[in-house]
Amino acid sequence: MESERTVGGRRSPTVVTGPLADYAAGFRQFLIAQGYARRTITVQVSLMAHLSRWLQAEGLTVDALRSSADIDRFFAERRARGHSSAVSANALVALLGFLRDRQVIGGPAADAGTPARRLLADYRRYLREERGSAAATVRGFSACAAMFLRVLPAERLEEALAAISAADVTRFVAGWAASRSPAYSKSMVSALRSVLRFLHSCGYIPRPLASAVPAVPGWRVAGRPRAVTGREVTAILAACDRGSARGRRDYAILMLLTRLGLRAGEVAGIGLSDIDWRQGLLMVRGKGNSLDGLPVPVDVGEAVADYIRHGRPRCKSRVLFVSVRAPFAGLSAASIGSAVRRACEAAGLDGFGPHRLRHAVACQLLREGASLNEIGQLLRQRDPRTTARYAIVDAGALAGLARPWPQGAER
């Protein structure tokens, strides 16, 4: 197996020859910047050297790396030569990502040029440039668009789009929402309306069908979620191993969720420059690209500072919360949810998601005498009905609002 060579008792870096030679130094620096361990960097550069020699022997250029068939042929030969590590296409994720970022190669050849792919790329560009949508919105709406296009025949996509009717839209929503929660389905229909408006404006569909998307009922009073108690909040905070990097990170995440009532996506989107330590303010990017400054309680600030000093890896990413292992990428909203569920498991509790902690903040404020209007302002909610829904989970507070039965009504 290729590795660092030993020359005069000392190790020297693997020399890359062939079509990839010009990119070897940059790739090595890329891996270092991403925080990969020295041994991993050695393996990755050795793999690059082997791949480059193989390309040269086969008379292929770097552009051949867009072909999954050529990549499979390389790994088949690598396994046949007795290699036991880095023997599948997953081992090339870092190298291919590096080459694509630098526009040395394009996307996979099998995916390029299909009508659906081109349409999705145009839709993402529309959301970013014309609508000014946040990154999370672009991802979510694009996923909905992909699911919608997937039910249409790929070989005659434009013809199928032109023939879509309001009844087709209704059937799609009904079939998709049947196995999803009302909350998730409601977000999906919002995305679908956006997709249909885009398709109509671009001439793919002749009629405006956004209004044909049916509404999804969202109120489920009989099945109202159980409120997370203060004792449970204390338990999940205590369950974090604050002696480890992951524990410090998860503790800081939980403090932001339980003290400020942030959404998972808002926590994931916090950057290092969003914290004003002198003023004690945190800039939060919310729904609709809103930007709000929230005062940071002392205990929350201490948790975040402890993570930055002793738990956050040194890396180029400017996102506050990053993965604990290389490559050090910013956490997604789903990763924030995983941190909550991990703490629940460690505390011996039934798992719940980050939004339940937002409910808990609202309920606690309600118990302390805050009005629904004040709670809505703190949680940055535009619709008072949304805030009222949080109050449903606190039966005790609602009971306190009930007027006593008139004594004169007794018989």
Show which residues each predicted segment covers.
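Conserved catalytic core of the tyrosine transesterase superfamily
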Residues: 1-411
